[in-house]
Amino acid sequence: MANERDNKYIDEEEVYNKSLLDQHLLDNDIDAFRDEFLGMHTYEQSEYFEDSDDEIRQRIFEVLSPEEVADFFEQLEFEEEEYDPLFDTMNANYASKVLENMSSDNAVDIMNQLSKQKVASMLTLMNKEDAKEIKALLHYEEDTAGGIMTTEYISLKVTTLVKEALMHVKEQAPDAETIYVIFAVNDHKQLVGVLSLRDLIVAENDAYIEDVMSERVVSANVADDQEDVAQKMRDYDFIAMPVVDYQDHLLGIITIDDILDVMDEEASEDYSRLAGVSDVNAKHDSVFKTAGKRLPWLITLTFLSMITATLIGSFEDTLSKVALLGAFIPIISGMSGNSGTQSLAVSVRKISTGEINEQSKFLVALREAGSGLISGVVCGILLIICIVVLHRQPILATIVGGSLTAAMTVGTLMGAVIPLIMNKLNIDPAVASGPFITTINDIISMLIYFGLATTLMSYLI
């Protein structure tokens, strides 16, 4: 019973038995495998495929049609370097048919991870219409609106009658990414309006599309950054957004499922950078590869930390006179780093969601500095009380408490201001990672602490 439970992959409501599916394939019980596998959700199918070894994957290709494989390939979440080896195990004709049957944007996402030779081979084997469509999309940068759009949408000329439009929608629906939003174009294929399926259904049959459509169209330029597009779609609560070129020609659409992927990707990327690592989602990396990705940041921070160590060493005289000062170094530097990291997270989040503009930058910095000051005063007073009670040294307590207050105030301000400066310079603010801010704040807090201690040394001895 325990073994059976271990072999079950559960996604809240859906349950499938991986071992049983594997056994069906290995026993060549094709009908049983197809019945169970094709009855699963495409997400579960992709999970099963990702968790399978090469032998099982090869059997899957043998018993499923390219159309059936294409359905769950839409959901695959492999690392970039895993796609080439995967396609090496597939027959070239079979692989090209799989890509043909995928939505164009998802097919392009996969092809962007393949070698140029494989892409050229796939395009040669695909039918001309699909190959032409995918070639056009491959020209766009991956992280732009053009890179995530699909060309499978429904558009209507403004001079089309509603009754004709309904027939057109019915014909195009099977291949369209969405039918709920329909775009109106003029004779030059320029975007001039938008209407919903509901608008079309309730309109009079003899009305023209230009009479039904809304001319207030919000669109994305093909070169817009995907993060900006995601923010715009979230602001307007769209399920689909048209993508146009610089002359307003309709090129494609971006749907909400693509935007959810973008938001997840951007959030993971920002989180990775804040943590000082290259990719928190690299679940298949070896320990050596993981270490290799993290070492550049760690080596940089090691050298930055040497500045802190050198700084503390330069105050050797002060430490030799009052050795107890050394006991509070971790508190001062740690709290300064903690407050800076909190402020950094808030600042980066506000920048990424578009909450900060030119007018509000000063207010954000002022608010964070005020928050740091209040937190610093409270923590400083508590620390003063503890030192007085434990060590009976009010002057030392005042120096440590005052340093903590100043360090937390400056640390919080640094955490807020550095991302704002980076954003102003068009540098991703998430690069100002937590470890980086912490190390910078260590240097500043030690300057404050030992500077104040040295200044008031005559009162300590």
What annotation goes with each model-predicted range?
Residues T42, W297-S305, F328, I332, ...:
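Alpha-helical transmembrane segments in multi-pass membrane proteins
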Residues V388, F450-I461:
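Transmembrane alpha-helix termini and helix-breaking/packing motifs in multi-pass membrane transporters
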Residues H284-P296, T300, I312, E316, ...:
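Alpha-helical membrane-interface segments at transmembrane helix boundaries
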Residues K132, D258-T290, T341-A365, L420-N426:
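Non-transmembrane, extramembrane segments of multi-pass ion/lipid transporters
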Residues S314-I329, H391-G402:
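Membrane-water interface of transmembrane alpha-helices in multipass transporters/channels
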Residues M422-N441:
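Interfacial loop-to-transmembrane junctions
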Residues T302-L319, L382-R392:
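Juxtamembrane "helix exit" motif at the C-terminal ends of alpha-helical transmembrane segments
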Residues A2-V277:
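Hydrophobic packing positions in regular secondary-structure scaffolds
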